[in-house]
Amino acid sequence: MRLAEGTGLLRSDFIEQDGILCVNIKPHPWRSLKTTSSARLIPLVGSSKWAAEKILALPDDNKFAFPRYNDGVKTNANSASAALNKWLKGKIGQGYIIHGFRHSMRDRLRAVECPSDIIDQIGGC
């Protein structure tokens, strides 16, 4: 998932499908998608499921999953990126950026010969 996709999520974008918690990546007026094929449903497991459950457990006084980065008109993914990169630098030092995780995931999926259409469904194309 691209950072802007996640940053612009609504709480209602987290849905249950066939008993599995998923995130529905779709365009919103405040955040478009890079391509039409970027719209997708991503199943959440492990720490991503845990994080989604924490978001959904918060008081629902705001429709956004990350209200700090949304004003209803625009998603500020650059601010989210800067905050995450600052946090990451404090944890593992220089030389890593948050955007690298998406590319690492795609590289690891290719390394285990995951079909490219599945890689695109997970990471967007």
Regions found by a protein language model. Name each.
Residues 28-29, 45-94:
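Active-site/catalytic core of tyrosine-dependent DNA strand-transfer enzymes
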Residues 20, 39-41, 61, 93, ...:
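Active-site lining segments that contact anionic ligands and/or coordinate catalytic metals
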Residues 5, 86, 100-125:
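C-terminal catalytic core of tyrosine-transesterase DNA break-rejoin enzymes
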Residues 9, 54-58, 112:
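Residue-level signal for well-ordered alpha-helical positions
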Residues 36, 98-99:
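Residue-level marker of regulatory loop/turn positions in helix-turn-helix DNA-binding domains and
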Residues 4, 8-53:
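Conserved tyrosine-mediated DNA breakage-rejoining catalytic core shared by Y-recombinases
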